[in-house]
Amino acid sequence: MIKDIKHLIEPMDFTVEELDEIFNLAHQIIAHPKEFSHICDGKILATLFYEPSTRTRLSFEAAMMRLGGKILGFSEPNSTSISKGETLADTIKMVSIYSDIITMRHPKEGAAKVASIYSNVPIINAGDGGHQHPTQTLADLLTITSLKNGLNNHRIGICGDLKFGRTVHSLIKAMSRYQNNKFVLISPKELAIPQYIREEVLAKNHIEYIEVEKLEDVIESLDILYMTRVQKERFFNEEEYLRLRDSYILDRAKMDLAKDDMIVMHPLPRVNEIAYEVDEDRRASYFKQAEYGMYVRMALMIKLLGVM
């Protein structure tokens, strides 16, 4: 039973045992959705999106509606008092009066942590800059445990933008908590994993990893391939973005080199890093991953609201 946990700012806010509770509850919801369709009757979720989002925002909204709750919020901060100079602290204080739980995406690292200081209701971090995206991580873990029979003993390839990709940083931190996982980090040097991940996560936890630049050299050894897009919004230089955007494209030829039981994951949206021909491959798991994301958010909100 999760006790005294008011916010989800990063995956480390939950113990491994508490994460297992959430995943088990998500599986119950998947198996028996009607049993949960009114569990959040009378509850209101506020969605505060200071950055553009389609899948994460709609996933949260669908999750709360499927639980019987209601939604309020914004996806365009310029249409709110924020455009008049209202501080994050004041916004959170006001919104926590109107709602029972808040999910927030913000371009500044640490914004969700700041919000949690001023909120009287649970805060769920839906992404803060290039820092953390914990509910995507929960979706990733639920996908892996469901499709690969648990969260231990995997060789995980992570490919693309490892520098700015907050989903990548959160996933490495989370999977490092489980047993005998190894990482293959695939990126151009310009988008390599940050040094703090190497030192504070991988080295500190004695996690085996290698860094390479060619996907085709390592794909045959992988149990899981986690693809990411090169994020245009993190670049100040258009030429550099265009040069790196097409660094890695997963196509049928590369899939032919992979294990029969490898799964391909992606946090979405994709640009062109996964060819559409791969969608027909039974190993393509990214749309299933998005579906799992909704169910794990349902389970998370049930736990944080204490309605079960």
UniProtKB/Swiss-Prot annotation:
Organism superkingdom: Bacteria
GO molecular function: amino acid binding; aspartate carbamoyltransferase activity
The protein's Enzyme Commission number: 2.1.3.2
Pathway: Pyrimidine metabolism; UMP biosynthesis via de novo pathway; (S)-dihydroorotate from bicarbonate: step 2/3
Enzyme class: transferase
Positions that bind carbamoyl phosphate: 55-56, 105, 133, 136, 268-269
GO biological process: 'de novo' pyrimidine nucleobase biosynthetic process; 'de novo' UMP biosynthetic process; amino acid metabolic process
Keyword vocabulary terms for this entry: Pyrimidine biosynthesis, Transferase
Chemical reaction(s) catalysed: carbamoyl phosphate + L-aspartate = N-carbamoyl-L-aspartate + phosphate + H(+)
Subunit relationships: Heterododecamer (2C3:3R2) of six catalytic PyrB chains organized as two trimers (C3), and six regulatory PyrI chains organized as three dimers (R2).
Protein name (Swiss-Prot/TrEMBL): Aspartate carbamoyltransferase catalytic subunit
Native source species: Clostridium beijerinckii (strain ATCC 51743 / NCIMB 8052)
Lineage summary: Bacteria, Bacillati, Bacillota, Clostridia, Eubacteriales
